């Protein structure tokens, strides 16, 4: 009887272990399924955020309605903020492959690699715009002088490196950023735009947003969809994207963005001081 009991116990133990293993396998499969579903929900939520953000930006733009006039030239201005980085180099490679031009609103970096990228941007027919030397909001938006000093410092670096003196810029966060009011007072944004124009420069916001800065890493399809939907029905699309070090999916999205914009009839140009700007309503 002792051996029989041991055998029965062993069978029961094996049965329990098999049951546990089966349960764990099912549990793991459920966890994986929930994880995948959660990722899909995040992407769907981001897409909804894209719609909301595009609507907000549309409301902020001055004279922003898409043109309904047929058969007019359509120009796309791809713009990349917050570089240079290794992503900038990959973006330049893609632009070269597609024979497309872009504008890079750069920040200050005096490494040899960054200087190489400043030079390459200009040498390959693209444009450089100023985006402040430091991109530290609490510093650059303290006052009109602090903002302009950051721009001058960056302008001198770019000019010394490339021989080209930039005359266009983009406010970090856009011209309607609330950080101007938070750090510099209610009148700072207005005084800055007037100062920029007095000095013979132009600033550019955007009317199409790739949404690649809405969270640390936005999926490639969401970026592509945001740009192509935002550009639909326009004759001029100033597209906001980013080439900061973390923006790997922006690089991945770029070929589909270029192909999609070409399919909509766009040709690619660089921003210049006399390009029709997109301006947000000031805070």
Name these PLM-found stretches.
Residues 1-68, 72-76, 93-102, 207, ...:
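Terminal accessory/targeting
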Residues 5-8, 12-15, 121, 125, ...:
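Membrane-targeting and insertion segments and their boundary/processing signals
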Residues 53-165, 276:
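Active-site beta->alpha N-cap acidic-glycine motif
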Residues 103-105, 129, 170, 204, ...:
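Structural detector of well-ordered beta-strand residues that form the stable sheet scaffold
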Residues 135-240, 244-260, 266, 273, ...:
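Catalytic domains of cell-wall/extracellular-matrix polysaccharide-remodeling enzymes
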């Amino acid at each position: 009887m002792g051996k029989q009991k041991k055998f029965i116990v062993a069978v029961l133990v094996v049965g329990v272990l098999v049951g546990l293993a089966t349960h764990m396998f099912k549990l793991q499969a459920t966890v994986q399924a929930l994880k995948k579903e959660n990722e899909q929900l995040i992407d769907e939520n981001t897409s909804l955020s894209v719609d909301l953000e595009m609507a907000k930006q549309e409301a902020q733009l001055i004279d922003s309605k898409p043109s309904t006039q047929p058969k007019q030239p359509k120009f796309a201005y791809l713009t990349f903020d917050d570089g240079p980085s290794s992503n900038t180099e990959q973006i330049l490679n893609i632009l070269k492959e597609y024979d497309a031009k872009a504008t890079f609103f750069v920040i200050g970096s005096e490494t040899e690699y960054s200087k190489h990228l400043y030079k390459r941007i200009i040498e390959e027919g693209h444009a450089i715009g100023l985006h402040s030397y430091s991109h530290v909001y609490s510093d650059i938006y303290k006052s009109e002088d602090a903002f302009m000093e950051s721009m001058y410092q960056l302008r001198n670096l770019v000019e010394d490196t490339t021989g080209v003196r930039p005359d266009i810029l983009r406010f970090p966060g856009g011209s309607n950023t609330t950080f101007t009011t938070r750090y510099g007072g209610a009148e700072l944004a207005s005084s800055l735009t007037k100062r920029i124009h007095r000095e013979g420069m132009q600033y550019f916001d955007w009317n199409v947003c790739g949404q690649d800065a809405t969270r640390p890493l936005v999926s490639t399809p969401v970026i592509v969809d945001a740009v192509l939907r935002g550009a639909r029905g326009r004759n001029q699309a100033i597209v906001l994207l980013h080439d900061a070090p973390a923006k790997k999916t922006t690089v991945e999205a770029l070929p589909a963005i270029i192909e999609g914009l070409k399919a909509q009839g766009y040709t690619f140009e660089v921003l210049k001081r006399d390009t029709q700007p997109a301006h947000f309503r000031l805070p």
